[in-house]
Amino acid sequence: EKKLRKYTYFKPLGILDTIYGLAENRDYIALKNEIIIFEGAKSVMLAASWGIYNTAALLTSHVNPYQLKILAKLGCRVVFALDKGINIREDENIKRLKRYVRVEYIWDKDDLLQEKDSPVDQGQEIWRTLYEGRLYYR
């Protein structure tokens, strides 16, 4: 007697093929024509407490091929606000992403953050300063 599998997985397991908060914030992202990408979910929640809803999180420090497709399909400006010390220019998938959408990023040139801080960790005023000084990734 041939036994059939109990479960069949049509998608590979163990991959991160989602962006935290995207589904909940899609309307705000469309309204602003911009998505701010954080590393962690906590930053998305903190930004929301300040009334900033066009945000989502990678849940890691780099963009994988699945997330690249998701961001490219959005067709809006992507602002990377990753933790201090993460250089987006070293990420091959972010380099690919700039072929499809405008990519900007937060860079703490004035040393306002502690090591490994998210751009929102030091409060709303510092976040605003960092966001207003964001750079265009050419």
Residue ranges of model-derived segments:
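TOPRIM fold recognition
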Residues: 44-138
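Phosphate-handling DNA/RNA-contact segment within nucleic-acid enzymes
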Residues: 1-74, 92
